[in-house]
Amino acid sequence: MGESLNGLKRTMMCGEPREEHVGKKITLMGWVQRNRKLGALEFVDLRDKTGIMQVVFGEEINAEAFEKAKGVRSEYCVAVTGEVVKRESVNENMPTGFVELKCENIKILSESETPPIYIKEDLDAAENIRLKYRYLDLRRSDMHKIFEIRSKTTKAIRDYLEENNFLDVETPILSKSSPEGARDYLVPSRNYPGMFYALPQSPQIFKQLLMVSGFDRYYQIAKCFRDEDLRANRQPEFTQVDMELSFVEQEDIMAVNEGLIAHVFKKVAGVDVQLPIKRMTFKDAMEKYGSDKPDLRFGMEITNITEDVKDLDFVVFKSAIEAGGSVRALCLKCGADLGRKPLDKLGEFVKTYKAKGLAWIQIKEDGVKSSIAKFLTDDVTNSIVKTMNAETGDAILIVADKNSVVFQSLGALRLELAKQFDLIKDKNEFNFTWITEFPLFEYSEEEERYKACHHPFTAPMDEDLDFIESDPGNVRSKAYDLVLNGEELGGGSIRIHDTALQERMFRALGLTDEVVNERFGYLLQAFKFGPPPHGGLAFGLDRMIMFLAGTENIKDVIAFPKNQNAYCYLSEAPNIVDEKQLTELGIAILPKEEKNDKE
């Protein structure tokens, strides 16, 4: 049975004692990292979130404490009181390594079974074990540091936004389902049988209603939920730094958020973000980097060589050009020494992105070698080399297809080459860029209609208003994403505040008046009462913490995350509920083929 504190107070944390505390009597509380016997002495490494302190027990120091210490085991929770003394054998690898505590009294506050994972920094336990015993995983000091960073970050965000006249307003968690976008998490209503709430994918409509309400500047650190197939670094529930502003244009919102980013990264990481953050249009990003979230920590831009090869009698190039596509390439410095096998592997790699293959040209000391040598002339080869700014020792990697395939495959290849050839020299660099002028619509082959690239409330560029009905595929939007090191950190847009324009948008999306009224009627009703021009943005807080904490795993920055199948090993959620609960809700579970997707 564990002992009680009985008024005993902790006077220092385990990671705090230093040489200047020698001779001072202190009380520490924490968990036993390990204990060991050395001659007539018993040593215990005591750990809390701040670090580890060595505690020494001996017959001559205190016989009762010495006897009790013999029984402690790993992860026992204890309180120790004694005098800080200099260590005979210094451990320079520990901040407390110059001192130790001569223990005069120990209280065993609670005992521990043998833990399923050993609490250490270089933990090698399987992820499912870490998630099942997350409370033990979180005892590690490097995990504590991550959540200290998270706490500092949210404080810095709140401080900045409130200094800039933003108001923190909570929006509903139980809301209305909208089939546009990802699947909703649905919550059945007991009071309204057969009807459901939805957990919010974002506070989008409610924050726009707050602008109609005259709140002017709103923010919220909001929980959001999406029932989607989880890719790497996605969670079914996540946190957004959400905001909306009235009487603003795109540049106003970008300026506010540049200030926010600069403030947070300086306060939390000591990083000076260079302002203003550079801008790049969606079109330029796709043509140069094959991605709407380009990693700009290295070069290797995609180059259009269509003009150089348009007269070649090579069916792959010719058919791509005739179909309205293009021929584009990357220049891999020092790639001329690559053998046929690695080049073939790169060819297989681009095929996974729907490219038909990869042509290549290597510029060697003794001439040019190419997979399409029999189709090339000296003039065309020289023209390609000049356009690519290639030099002796380089390799030119070429894809020909419709533009969407060319961009996607070469964009992915660019990132793959960066990994293989270690092209990102400064892994600690924070390289920000704004991506602007996204398409307003994207065509869904599956549904045979245009869909909103972002959401149906995004405003089109003024100069493209006339093309919403006649040429929707080429209409640009007043949408913007903030990209950091090839990851989308946040995104937003100027919203449509004109009812007539909003109705045109819904019609272009193929939504009937009945559907629009059912899904968004309450927003459109509000827009009859003088909505201001407004816009906003949302940052992914979890992703921001990943960058600030230097981790690549989103589960590290969420206290109790789910696995890739949205399963919680700790609480074993989701779970089967009582039949009585289902009956109250008017729900019957249909039989389904059983499968285990927990892993």
From Swiss-Prot:
Annotated region (Aspartate), positions in chain: 204-207
Protein name: Aspartate--tRNA ligase
EC class: ligase
Localization terms from the record: Cytoplasm
EC number: 6.1.1.12
Subunit structure: Homodimer.
The organism of origin for this protein: Clostridium beijerinckii (strain ATCC 51743 / NCIMB 8052)
Chief localisation class: cytoplasm
Catalysed reaction equations from the record: tRNA(Asp) + L-aspartate + ATP = L-aspartyl-tRNA(Asp) + AMP + diphosphate
Keyword Nucleotide-binding tagged: yes
Family to which this protein belongs: Belongs to the class-II aminoacyl-tRNA synthetase family. Type 1 subfamily.
Keyword Calcium applies: no
GO molecular function: aspartate-tRNA ligase activity; ATP binding; catalytic activity, acting on a protein; nucleic acid binding; transferase activity
Keywords: Aminoacyl-tRNA synthetase, ATP-binding, Cytoplasm, Ligase, Nucleotide-binding, Protein biosynthesis
Protein function: Catalyzes the attachment of L-aspartate to tRNA(Asp) in a two-step reaction: L-aspartate is first activated by ATP to form Asp-AMP and then transferred to the acceptor end of tRNA(Asp).
Annotated binding of L-aspartate, by residue: 180, 226, 454, 495
Record-listed ATP binding positions: 226-228, 235, 488, 540-543
Gene Ontology CC, one term: cytoplasm
Matching PANTHER family: ASPARTATE--TRNA LIGASE, MITOCHONDRIAL (PTHR22594:SF5), ASPARTYL/LYSYL-TRNA SYNTHETASE (PTHR22594)
A biological process term (GO) from this entry: aspartyl-tRNA aminoacylation
